[in-house]
Each structure stands twice: as structure tokens, then as C-alpha cells.
Design a protein with these regions (language model features):
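Residue-level recognition of single "structural anchor" positions
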Residues: 2-378
Length: 378
């Protein structure tokens, strides 16, 4: 009963902590001072899971030893050192150049204690490994821990619940999320939809503190309190795009900037009666198939010609809701993550492997102090 009570108290603390944070990801309510205060609270509230009331006792009962050893096993499972297979994976990476000066003239230079291959650059004289200047540089937690973290992200788990499941602090979850965003920056830049393209916009509300009002009431409908998110889907359902338009009401200019490089010339455009889409039809010589809201209202999914894009709207909003306190200024980062989840490869383990390969081959080191500074926590 004591163990069950402690577990319930810990769960209650986590729920209270999540309410204080208002969700996961970048919180628009966090200032540098508040971030420091919250970190102090986290240190007080998140006491070590290996701390027991009998820890100082020289003699322990069989029951106490059972609980203590079980918790230690949990901790070890969640905080393992780098495995042999992980070291072999790191050492198998094909290093092309020095991560510091870009020189191709480097040579092997022994190994680290864990067996990781070290190199030395003949140009600048600096030593490095295959992970230098990547998001895994100076890692304290094995890369293998990322597998479970990414699987949770892909399944729409909140960052706080993922951190708790993995026995990590909430700040670790946020830090890793920022690293994830960094790897995925620009991932949609070269996506081009062809064939039959379904296109429609969806909208997200601004934070309450930034809502414009009239006579003390929120503006109705599509107003400047919304952030436009343009979405296009290919008919073969193999590709999609999720791009912030930056406008509350589409214009010919914003529509061109959002979609023009992502739709192949001569494609078939299936859309609603939004007037701004006309610039795409004109400049990309698209065949237009228009279905007004009045025509599609009340239709079942199977009968609605805009279902492919409407379904993505639904999934996107479900994903965003699972991260309620996301910072609207970083909405494109969230859309890049959602794009990665929704597009090939479909298998979740293939997706995890693809991300890890992208990360180790990307010179994008993210330092903790920079990542958790005011520019990210606003």
C-alpha cells in the first residue's frame, strides 16, 4: 500500500507539473526568470526516483530491498550506457570532412573510453568523432534512448508524459524537442506535389494574450486572431505539405508564396472556391476543379471530394492539441515534425532510423544553454 500511495503521489505531482507548464514544447508564457524559477521547482518536486525513506538504514528488510532493487533496474534500463551496437553504428558512419574547418585531410586518432573512433584534422589540428557538431554531440544519454522518445512523438504523446515515461526530466524532453526541430528545418523545401493536388487552408487561434477584440469580444470567423496554415495533398497520398501562410485571410500574394514551388506545372488542382487560388491556376497552368463549401457541406467523408485534405486538417489539429502550449512563433517547426510523421517512410521504426541518420549526418549542434534561452522559451 505504501508503494502504491507513493506512486499515486508521484503521478499527482506530474499532473500538477503539466498543468503549471500548460502543455509541452515552447511555452509562450515562459520568460528567462520564470524558466529559472520553474527549473528550481522541478528540482524540488522531481526528487530522485531512487530515494527511499529507508535509504540511510544499514539494515533493510527483504521487502525494502525488493522495491529498491526493482526501481534501480528500472533506472538502469532507462539510463543505459552506449551499447556495443551503438558504438559500432557510430564508427560505421562515413566521415566526409572535419566538422570544424571542413578539411578533407584527416586521419584516425585512437578511441574514446567507450570505443568510439576519434579523428584528428591535419588542417586545423582539432580532434573529433562522427557525432561532433551534431545534436548528439557531448551526449549524456545514449542515442538508443532517442528511439523511444521519437516513437512517442510519432504517436502524438505530449512531451511531459514522454519525459516521465522515460525517467527523464521535463526540461530534457523540451531540449530534445528543440533538437528534433533543428534537424527537420527545411525538410519540406523541395517537396513538389504533382498529379491531382488537393488544396485547402486551415487556421489556428493566437494565444489569448494576443487576441484582438472588438467591444471586449473576440473577433468571429476567419480574423486576424488566426494564423493561416496552407495544406496541399497529392492524390496518390504519398506526399503532402504543411506550410504557415502567415496570414489570417489568403491573398494572391500569400498563396503564391506558400504553394507555387510545391505544385508541379500542369497538375489538377482540387480546391474550394477561395479566390486567391486563381494565381496558381494562371501561373502554373493548372486544371481547376472547384467544390464550394456549400456543395460539400453535410457530405460524408467518402462522398466529399476534398476529404484527403480535410482529413489532414483533422489529424493536424489533433496533433497540435496534444501539445497545447506550443509557441505560435515556432508553428512551422511543429508543422515540419507533423510532415515527417505523415509522410514516407510509413513504418515507425523506419521513420526513427531515418531521423537518426539525418541527425548524425547534419552539422547542427544544439547547446543546452542556447536552446533553453529566452529566444526559445518566449
Amino acid at each position: 500500500m505504501l508503494v502504491e500511495r507513493q506512486a499515486l503521489e508521484e503521478l499527482h505531482e506530474v499532473n500538477n507539473h503539466q498543468e503549471e507548464l500548460g502543455g509541452s514544447g515552447y511555452s509562450s508564457r515562459e520568460t528567462p526568470n520564470r524558466q529559472i524559477q520553474m527549473n528550481k521547482k522541478e528540482r524540488r518536486k522531481y526528487s530522485s526516483l531512487r530515494s527511499f525513506t529507508w535509504s540511510e538504514n544499514q539494515e533493510k528488510s527483504e521487502g525494502q530491498l525488493l522495491v529498491e532493487n526493482t526501481v534501480q533496474e528500472w533506472y538502469n534500463a532507462k539510463h543505459a550506457t552506449s551499447s556495443v551496437s551503438e558504438i559500432e553504428f557510430i564508427n560505421s558512419l562515413d566521415i566526409k570532412q572535419c566538422p570544424f574547418c571542413g578539411s578533407h585531410d584527416f586521419t584516425k586518432y585512437g578511441h574514446k573510453k567507450d570505443g568510439t573512433q576519434r579523428y584528428i584534422c591535419k588542417g586545423c589540428g582539432k580532434r573529433f568523432t562522427a557525432l561532433t557538431n551534431t545534436i548528439f554531440d557531448s551526449k549524456k544519454i545514449p542515442i538508443s534512448e532517442w528511439i523511444e522518445y521519437l516513437l512517442h512523438l510519432f504517436e502524438f504523446h505530449s512531451i511531459n508524459s514522454t519525459a516521465y515515461d522515460n525517467r527523464n526530466s521535463p526540461t530534457t524532453g523540451k531540449y530534445w524537442l528543440i533538437k528534433t526541430f533543428e534537424v527537420l528545418k527545411g525538410i519540406q523545401d523541395n517537396v513538389v506535389l504533382d498529379g491531382t493536388v488537393y488544396l485547402d487552408e486551415t487556421y489556428f487561434a493566437k494565444t489569448k494574450s494576443k487576441l484582438a477584440t472588438k467591444d471586449g469580444k473576440k473577433l468571429r470567423g476567419i480574423s486576424r486572431n488566426k494564423i493561416g496554415v496552407g495544406v496541399g495533398v497529392a492524390c496518390n497520398e504519398t506526399k503532402s505539405i504543411f506550410i504557415v501562410t502567415g496570414t489570417s485571410k489568403p491573398s494572391r500574394k500569400s498563396t503564391k508564396e506558400t504553394y507555387s514551388k510545391h505544385i508541379a506545372r500542369g497538375s489538377i488542382l482540387v480546391h474550394d472556391d477561395e479566390h486567391s487560388h486563381s494565381i496558381l491556376i494562371e501561373e502554373l497552368e493548372l486544371e481547376s476543379k472547384v467544390y464550394s463549401t456549400r456543395e460539400t457541406k453535410g457530405l460524408s467523408d467518402k462522398d466529399n471530394p476534398l476529404y484527403p485534405v480535410n482529413n489532414l486538417h483533422l489529424l493536424l489539429k489533433q496533433f497540435i492539441r496534444s501539445h497545447g502550449a506550443y509557441d505560435r512563433e515556432h508553428l512551422q517547426d511543429w508543422l515540419n515534425l507533423f510532415w515527417f510523421i505523415m509522410n514516407d517512410p510509413k513504418d515507425k521504426y523506419d521513420k526513427v532510423l531515418k531521423f537518426i541518420e539525418m541527425a548524425v549526418l547534419s552539422p547542427k549542434r544544439v547547446r543546452y544553454r542556447d536552446a533553453m534561452s529566452s529566444k526559445h522559451s518566449k
